Amino acid sequence: MKNRIHNFNAGPAALPLPVLEEIQAELLDFKGSGMSIMEVSHRSKWFDDVINETVERINRLMGLGDDFQVLFMQGGASTQFALVPMNLLPEGQSADYVNTGTWSTKAIKEAQAMGKTVNVAASSEDRNFCYIPKDIPLDPNAAYVHITSNNTIKGTAYTDFPDAGNVPLIADMSSDILSRPIDASKFGLIYAGAQKNMGPAGVCVAIIRKDMLERVPASLPSMFKYTTFADKNSMYNTPPCFAIYTVGLVVKWIEETIGGLEKMEARNRKKADTLYSIFDSSDFYSGTADKDSRSLMNVTFRLPSEDLEKAFVAQALENGLGGLKGHRSVGGCRASIYNPTSQEGIEALVDFMKEFEKKNG
């Protein structure tokens, strides 16, 4: 489509063009209602169908059984950092956290601020979070083990999740949910802000194993309890209808157009391999993550100088390649290549990188 750039922003991020076109086509008249999806009542059959179909597609894509429930919440993953220990870490118990970067650090600090007992079981801070720890010593009596599955700022990700035995894993999957198949049975809770890989900002998807709901203290305020959302099909109060609707279109695209998570993973690996090959064959670009910890979603890299990095980002945008500036906390460059990013976009970026190196190397 004319005037559309290749969008490598970290979040809010690219959405599939067919999804945007479907939104555009029915924006003024949703399913013959004579109203926009932003105008229909969340108590109507129109929205009932939206939320129920979205849940069903997520269940199918992730292979979730009847022992899981999909919730749509607000406040992003940052709110989950507090809600997880509030709901799922009983008094007198501790939880293991693995620290792999900025978002893990925030989750740890939030749990500690709640007065909870937190054990940092492993950390990659010793090398500036450029790797994922292995052989993590976990407490078999912990209430849960919390991980951040993909680290957007440093460009690292788990290839295999920790073996926690009978202790439930809890994962912030904001930046890699639905990017590959996973064994959901290992998890007590998966949560993800939608704005990176599932849809627009405004909704956080929480996938909770139903037995975990038994831990929720009755004394918590209603809007802070997972049970409130589970009991009311995420409609205790007015939900973020437009965001949920868009998530529904994205999971429909993954299921019907891409063909499921195995095909999505193959697509994502091809994109990442194409981009990482530049670092492995060049002295001009250097990746910041260890090879065995590289993310398929966020490719972080440096150039020989900050001046060159600024020129790279500016000239890339002039060539229709946007969002390549690294996170403000670390600098450098970053290409976020979430599910919607096309192989065509990756090839365009690689061609630009080769040309930029030729002129400036």
UniProtKB/Swiss-Prot annotation:
Asked if the keyword Transmembrane helix belongs to this entry, the reply reads no
GO terms assigned for molecular function: O-phospho-L-serine:2-oxoglutarate aminotransferase activity; pyridoxal phosphate binding
Gene Ontology cellular-component terms for this entry are: cytoplasm
Q: Where in the cell is it found?
A: Cytoplasm
Primary localisation category = cytoplasm
* Catalytic reaction(s) noted: O-phospho-L-serine + 2-oxoglutarate = 3-phosphooxypyruvate + L-glutamate; 4-(phosphooxy)-L-threonine + 2-oxoglutarate = (R)-3-hydroxy-2-oxo-4-phosphooxybutanoate + L-glutamate
Q: What is its EC number?
A: 2.6.1.52
Binding positions for pyridoxal 5'-phosphate per the UniProt entry: A77, S78, W103, T152, D172, Q195, N237, T238
Cofactors required: pyridoxal 5'-phosphate
What binding details are noted for the cofactor? Binds 1 pyridoxal phosphate per subunit.
For this entry, list what GO says about its biological process.
Answer: L-serine biosynthetic process; pyridoxine biosynthetic process
Which residues participate in L-glutamate binding?
R43
N6-(pyridoxal phosphate)lysine modifications at: K196
Question: Is Amino-acid biosynthesis included in the keywords of this UniProt record?
Answer: yes
Name the enzyme group at the top EC level: transferase
SUPFAM superfamilies in the record: PLP-dependent transferases
Q: Which UniProt keywords apply?
A: Amino-acid biosynthesis, Aminotransferase, Cytoplasm, Pyridoxal phosphate, Pyridoxine biosynthesis, Serine biosynthesis, Transferase
Similarity comment: family membership: Belongs to the class-V pyridoxal-phosphate-dependent aminotransferase family. SerC subfamily.
HAMAP family cross-referenced by the UniProt entry: SerC_aminotrans_5
Which PANTHER family does the record associate with it?
PHOSPHOSERINE AMINOTRANSFERASE
Q: How does it assemble?
A: Homodimer.
Q: What does this protein do?
A: Catalyzes the reversible conversion of 3-phosphohydroxypyruvate to phosphoserine and of 3-hydroxy-2-oxo-4-phosphonooxybutanoate to phosphohydroxythreonine.
Listed name of the protein? Phosphoserine aminotransferase
Taxonomy of the source species = Bacteria, Pseudomonadati, Thermodesulfobacteriota, Desulfobacteria, Desulfobacterales
